[in-house]
Regions:
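N-terminal binding-site loop/beta-alpha segment at the start of enzyme catalytic domains
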Residues: 1-74, 136, 142
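Structural motif corresponding to the early beta-alpha repeats
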Residues: 51, 65-92, 117
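Glycine/proline-rich, positively charged
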Residues: 40, 86-174
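Active-site beta-loop-alpha junctions enriched in small/polar residues
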Residues: 21-23, 49-51, 75-79, 116-119, ...
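Active-site mouth loops of central-metabolism enzymes
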Residues: 16-30, 79-96, 122-126
Length: 174
């Protein structure tokens, strides 16, 4: 496997990562085998932006014993609950519940890369700030629960706007 070193963090990140949306359809046993095979092939970066909460316990069961070898990317604001369909939220209490649930299901006490999820309009960012979500995430980072905070958007202009609004150019850089 080829790797890139993140110059800001020192993390060695595989050039191939694994997304998770289709994993639960294969079933827990096949899903775990897929993750184990990916790890054996040197893949160490796993993106947990998914429409199905069932992938989280599969990851927890398959990779908890090798947690130090993998990098998890989760998405804050993606709202998961067992057996419920995916939703998106800027509500602080919902984000807190979702983060706690994800940590529990992944059988870990930290998240490597946490993305503020699906920021596509200026109002989305404003709600994150006004609702206290950004402050909560920064508290998690200070506690070591989240190593790095980033932003997920489909709108490049919004990414530039958020970076300008936060007033700290390095705030969201890995």
């Amino acid at each position: 496997m080829e790797y890139r070193v993140n110059r800001r963090t020192g993390d060695r990140i595989s050039v191939l990562g694994v997304g998770t949306s289709g994993l639960p359809a294969a079933g827990a046993k096949e899903g775990a085998a897929t993750l184990e095979m990916a790890l054996e092939q040197g893949i160490n970066y796993f993106d947990l932006a998914t429409a199905d909460s069932a992938c989280f316990p599969i990851f927890g069961a398959a990779l908890a014993g090798v947690r130090k070898q993998v990098l998890y990317q989760v998405h804050f604001g993606a709202n998961y609950a067992a057996g419920k369909p995916y939703s998106w939220t800027t509500d602080l209490e919902a984000v807190k519940r979702s983060v706690a649930w994800q940590l529990e299901q992944l059988r870990t006490d930290y998240i490597d890369y946490g993305f503020i999820h699906c920021m596509d309009e200026s109002g989305d960012w404003r709600r994150y700030v006004d609702n206290g979500v950004l402050q909560y995430l920064e508290t998690l980072k200070a506690q070591g629960v989240v190593r790095h905070i980033g932003l997920s958007t489909h709108t490049p202009a919004l990414a530039r706007e958020v970076l300008a609004l936060c007033g700290q150019p390095n705030r969201f850089r890995f």
